Curated annotation (Swiss-Prot):
One Pfam family per UniProt: Flavin_Reduct
Primary gene name: rutF
EC number, UniProt record: 1.5.1.42
Keywords: Flavoprotein, FMN, NAD, Oxidoreductase
Family label: Belongs to the non-flavoprotein flavin reductase family. RutF subfamily.
Species name: Ancylobacter novellus (strain ATCC 8093 / DSM 506 / JCM 20403 / CCM 1077 / IAM 12100 / NBRC 12443 / NCIMB 10456) (Starkeya novella)
This protein's name: FMN reductase (NADH) RutF
Job description of the protein: Catalyzes the reduction of FMN to FMNH2 which is used to reduce pyrimidine by RutA via the Rut pathway.
Gene Ontology BP annotations: nitrogen utilization; uracil catabolic process
PANTHER family (alphabetical): FLAVIN REDUCTASE, FMN REDUCTASE (NADH) RUTF
Domain of life: Bacteria
UniProt catalytic activity: FMNH2 + NAD(+) = FMN + NADH + 2 H(+)
Keyword Flavoprotein (UniProt): yes
Disulfide pairings: none
Length: 181
């Protein structure tokens, strides 16, 4: 079996690597399946929401997740002004709602397409979400075109064992609900 040569300690091999184009990177990322979420907020900055698949757990002590928010998103001002979000994990059948929140649809039309109730932080929770994480934003880090929001989870709303929704290869796919046992 062939072995690859280790990089030297100066990491000079990295400097010789060819640049990866934006298109190559996006094509590769399309092969990384991810849960589809709608991130919502409400408060002094207004009611807003956006579709996100760049969401993941950071730690369970304290429970924290991260959300990547495009700085040019129509929801960016409201999210930062309110300081709270609810990460609603979508179920199979929520594809149209995901598309509304992922496009240029006005906020009032986005929210009119779903049923919502209010979380403890004031952020909207989607009725029928697989699970919703009610959060307060504790830190924001700017990286390129996005803000990475570190969100402390202050509440959960579980919607049961419905099929989840993932985005993979530029298409939606349903995944089985929670296993028993």
């Amino acid at each position: 079996m062939a072995r690859s040569a280790p990089l030297d300690e100066t990491n000079s091999g990295a400097a010789k690597a060819p640049a990866i184009s934006r298109e190559q990177y996006r094509d590769a990322m399309a092969r990384l399946g991810a849960a589809v979420t709608i991130v919502t907020t409400d408060g002094p900055g207004g009611r807003a929401g956006f579709t996100a698949s760049a969401v993941c757990s950071v730690t369970d002590s304290p429970p924290t997740l991260l959300v990547c928010l495009n700085k040019s998103s129509s929801a960016a001002h409201a999210v930062h002004a309110n300081g709270v979000v609810c990460v609603n994990t979508l179920a199979a059948g929520h594809e149209a709602l995901s598309n509304l929140f992922g496009g240029r649809t006005p906020p009032e039309e986005r929210f009119a397409a779903g049923q919502w109730h209010t979380s403890a932080t004031g952020a909207p929770i989607l009725v029928g979400a697989v699970v919703a994480f009610d959060c307060r934003i504790v830190k924001t880090v700017e990286v390129g075109t996005h803000d990475v929001l570190f969100c402390e989870v202050v509440g959960l709303a579980e919607g049961g064992g419905r099929e989840g929704l993932i985005y993979f290869s530029r298409r939606y796919h349903a995944v089985a609900g929670t296993p028993e046992g």
